[in-house]
Amino acid sequence: MSKDGKPDRCIAYVSEKVGGKFSALPCVAGVSCLKNRTSVEFSTEKIYEPYVRKETASAVAEVLVLFYKYRFFSDLLPLPSLKQEERELLLTALVSADFQTDKKYTETRLSGLDEYRIDGVFFFRLQELKESWVRIASYVPNEFSPAALYSFVQFLSSEGEGRIFLQGESAYDEEYRPLKKSALIGEYSAPKEILLSGARHVYCFGEQTEETKDFLKKYYAEKTFFC
């Protein structure tokens, strides 16, 4: 996988996700920079290559439908009626809403490529997907209100599936794997991680910040369990 620019959160995400998945196998990640382009390559034994490639494609697809989609919506939606934190929450919710569908489509567009030049894929192989994002953005009025945000996030939480676990502010999926999707759209945030997970129930251990508690009380009041 390669990307224009210096090593960044996208490179780190793919490297950590794939490397972590195969940490018990002879799989080595190497990051290199050449002419203002950064690449991450994975070396493994031939028998494991199909599995490493599949996981790499999955991670690259997540970068495209998280990092790139968030920036895409951010450019289209100024949302002056919302505070900065409310706007970020709405953008996160919009990214989360079709995450699985977007990811599956993106994986089909990666199929057959020898190298994932991630910015090239975004600009030239995701036209249909980007057109759907433009349509979605057109449904969001410039005067989108905090009340509308509340209703939208409430709807997403009611449609969620599965569980997410919080140990303090660290989020884990049902297999207790750390979740770091929110790091692709800004600073790591437990509330954003909850939204991006698409979970229906939240199980909390340890102590959460007031920000996270307020988020849970507002949007997941009947779906949160403190253990």
Predicted features and spans:
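C-terminal structured domains
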Residues: E174-C227
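Conserved mixed alpha/beta catalytic, RNA-binding, or beta-rich assembly cores of soluble enzyme
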Residues: M1-Y188, K192-I194
